[in-house]
């Protein structure tokens, strides 16, 4: 293969790697911990941290999955 062909192949592979969307299961979890369980009926508000806005985390409390602001401990 010529050097031009190799450069084209490398460029296409790089572009594919940049444009391929990263699924939420491959992303690291957001920092912090979930606060204590709220006292409310079952609700499924989120599936993972990345379905929550900003710094909020998707916190699972049994039958409750909801976006909550994280708490940080030292």
Curated annotation (Swiss-Prot):
Residues 1-24 form the signal peptide. GO terms for biological process: antibacterial humoral response; innate immune response; venom-mediated disruption of cell wall in another organism. Residues 27-71 form the WAP domain. It is found in: Secreted. Its main location: secreted. Expressed by the venom gland. GO terms for cellular component: extracellular region; extracellular space. Keywords: Antibiotic, Antimicrobial, Disulfide bond, Secreted, Signal. InterPro entries: Elafin-like_sf (IPR036645), WAP_dom (IPR008197), WAP_four-disulfide_core (IPR050514). Disulfide bonds join 34-59, 42-63, 46-58, 52-67. One of its GO terms (molecular function) is serine-type endopeptidase inhibitor activity. PROSITE patterns: WAP (PS51390). It comes from the Eukaryota. Pfam families: WAP (PF00095). Damages membranes of susceptible bacteria. Has no hemolytic activity. Not toxic to mice. Does not inhibit the proteinases elastase and cathepsin G. PANTHER family: ELAFIN, WHEY ACDIC PROTEIN WAP. Belongs to the venom waprin family. This is Auswaprin-a. It comes from Pseudechis australis (Mulga snake). The lineage of its organism: Eukaryota, Metazoa, Chordata, Craniata, Vertebrata.
